[in-house]
Curated annotation (Swiss-Prot):
Gene name in the database record: fabZ
This protein's record includes keyword rRNA-binding: no
Upper classification of the organism: Bacteria, Pseudomonadati, Pseudomonadota, Gammaproteobacteria, Enterobacterales
One term of GO molecular function: (3R)-hydroxyacyl-[acyl-carrier-protein] dehydratase activity
HAMAP family (alphabetical): FabZ
Active-site residues, record numbering mapped to chain: 54
Name recorded for this polypeptide: 3-hydroxyacyl-[acyl-carrier-protein] dehydratase FabZ
Function in brief: Involved in unsaturated fatty acids biosynthesis. Catalyzes the dehydration of short chain beta-hydroxyacyl-ACPs and long chain saturated and unsaturated beta-hydroxyacyl-ACPs.
């Protein structure tokens, strides 16, 4: 059985997402299928600036940044599924439901984000996301994103 694996390197991710250091939280896309799912990776380094204060002597990736990494993965999936934004359009993180944190993410971890498309209704697209380290769930959530024109 052969699979058609789609990967994206950092150069391609930078073409899709507006985020830059220190807020770009997707290092590589491991696989995706347009309109269905995406698997991406974030390599967690002790050199990340937020570890200075979260927490000194016991660095833990802030949960909100785990969610942001999953949201960025949904953005990549959306762009690969329906195309890049038109001039004057933005893709907003519009909501989150059922967010659960299961275990901490620490420097040296390789966090895998798996996001799946659920549905689009009234301009909102709903995704399910899970983040894993060593095959164990560290976070899961349902996220909503909206594509809209700038005011």
């Amino acid at each position: 059985m052969t699979t058609n694996t789609h990967t994206l390197q950092i150069e391609e991710i930078l073409e899709l997402l507006p985020h830059r250091f220190p807020f770009l939280l997707v290092d590589r896309v491991l696989d995706f299928e347009e309109g269905r799912f995406l698997r991406a990776v974030k390599n967690v380094s002790v050199n990340e600036p937020f570890f200075q204060g979260h927490f000194p002597g016991k660095p833990i990736l802030p949960g909100v940044l785990i969610l942001e990494a999953m949201a960025q993965a949904t953005g990549i999936l959306a762009f690969k599924s329906v195309g890049k934004l038109e001039p004057g359009e933005l893709y907003y993180f519009a909501g989150i439901d059922e967010a659960r944190f299961k275990r901490p993410v620490v420097p040296g971890d390789q966090m895998i984000m798996e996001v799946t498309f659920e549905k689009t209704r009234r301009g909102l697209t709903r995704f399910k996301g899970v983040a894993l380290v060593d095959g164990k769930v560290v976070c899961e959530a349902t996220m909503m994103c909206a594509r809209s024109r700038e005011a």
